[in-house]
Amino acid sequence: MKISKKDALMWFRFFAELPEDEPLMPHQQELAWAVISQIEAAVDARHKELMAQIPDLHTLGGRTYFVGDPAKFSKGCTSCLTGTGLSAIRRTNKCNIRCPFCYNYGELDCQETIGEGLWEIVGTYFRVEDIDLLLSTSNRPTGVSYVYLEPFMEIELYPDIIRKFRAAGIHQHMYTNGTLCTEENLRALGEAGLDELRFNLGATSCADNVIQSIATAKKYIPTVAIETPMTPDFYEHFQQKKDVILATGLDFINCAELHLNPNNLPNYIGTPMYMTRRGYVSPIWSREITFRLMRQCAVEHWGIVVHDCSNHTKFARDLNLRAKEGGWFGASSYHSEFDQIPFEAFLPTLEDSDFRFLEEEPLPKGYRPGDIVL
């Protein structure tokens, strides 16, 4: 049904008042998902308009979009989207800063430890000396990534395992907020064989010392990039320091569409939201900022790749991964971070007078107020 925005707001205000443990009845569920669909359709149409304004927009088999030289597109992203996926390796359960967009916001001091001397790969625990066994018994991934939480809290532990995967010819990338980088530890990572280092520049609002570390990293590591959630705060600080940032010699910017979970959602209450394919919930402005940066890169000829790491991209990533694993046609682990629709989060979207649905129809009989047994 093409529910009107007025009716959508009325029903979502009602649903937001219901007790969390009270399930919606079937007709109510239809109404709820009709509203989510109407919002998503309007946002998708806006995205198409913005993409049409980007010169020389490239796609990776329809799985994602980027601007810049296709030959410079990240091998880590290529592995994620067309290879064996992200292949996350976890070790460090601590972080030295607190970011409002962090998925572990409010829980950083109680993250489960991996264990002394151990590395977690897809729920299995290994010592460095076990990696040879793993490589000899399993299908080799096209790439691996070091995640969770800030690896530079104990970066001295990483070179040994990096050397193992380097010797096996497997592409490796790592994420960092950049605040603990030094010439010495960056050199050690480069010498061990790290292929990509990605800086979350939004974590520090584009701090000068982190920008300098990007330049230093480029001396030792083949590919150096920015990967950060797209927020108005990041966009503002990036524009203020754009020339200095681009002068570091970085190779690409991975524009992550900010998606929310119960931990970080409270930091963005009041922001217009939408949901992608009944999965990730995101501020509407996040991917729009990505498109603004992509257009700016193309028009100003930055000479780097700017990549749209959106909810759509992550949807494609999981389809690719499940297919590579031999999953059923259509199988995916892409899903919402919420047990039920966070109705309150969508009220700002429905209350925004500038946000319009593409089509509207009167509610059919049986779905109007008073028709449904509540």
Regions found by a protein language model. Give the residues of each.
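Core AdoMet radical
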Residues: 107-125, 138-154, 168-181, 192-209, ...
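N-terminal [4Fe-4S]-dependent radical SAM core
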Residues: 6-91, 106-113
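Accessory C-terminal segments flanking Radical SAM cores
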Residues: 2-9, 14, 33-36, 305-374
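Distinct, well-ordered alpha-helical segments
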Residues: 155-163, 182-190, 209-213, 238-241, ...
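Surface-exposed amphipathic alpha-helices with a cationic face
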Residues: 103, 158-169, 190, 213-219, ...
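Cysteine-centered iron-sulfur cluster-binding motifs in ferredoxin-type domains/subunits
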Residues: 90-100, 150
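Non-catalytic positions within long, well-ordered alpha-helices that form the structural scaffold/packing
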Residues: 136-137, 187-193, 246
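Conserved C-terminal portion of the radical SAM core fold
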Residues: 211-317, 331-342
